[in-house]
Amino acid sequence: MSRSVKKPPFCAPHVLRLANRVIASNRTSVVINIHSRSSVILNKFVGLTFGVYNGKTYVPVKVTDNIVGRKFGEFSPTRRFLGHAGDKKVSRKG
């Protein structure tokens, strides 16, 4: 089910607070480290760089016009695919 049209997009309050602080100081080159993968990327974040935590490291996400409206977690994968298991060769004796 999609989100109700009446509700605004969800963005964690601490993410908004950190972004507003960086915007007010005009230091757009600083990386804002966040854990909130479920927060929606807003228009005011364009030009900022966020470090989205994937459980191990902070993955840098540069916000552009193309990714506004999507969630931070989409750009920080939590699992690494190592490939499917190969066929095990059965060794026969004798």
Swiss-Prot record:
Quick one: which gene encodes this?
Answer: rpsS
Q: Which organism is it from?
A: Anaplasma phagocytophilum (strain HZ)
Family listed: Belongs to the universal ribosomal protein uS19 family.
GO molecular function terms here?
A: rRNA binding; structural constituent of ribosome
What InterPro entries does the annotation carry?
Ribosomal_uS19, Ribosomal_uS19_bac-type, Ribosomal_uS19_CS, Ribosomal_uS19_SF
Stated role: Protein S19 forms a complex with S13 that binds strongly to the 16S ribosomal RNA.
* Listed transmembrane segments: none
Could you tell me the superkingdom of the organism this chain comes from?
Answer: Bacteria
Q: Which HAMAP family does the record match to this protein?
A: Ribosomal_uS19
Q: Does the keyword NADP apply?
A: no
Pfam families in the record: Ribosomal_S19
Q: What is this protein called?
A: Small ribosomal subunit protein uS19
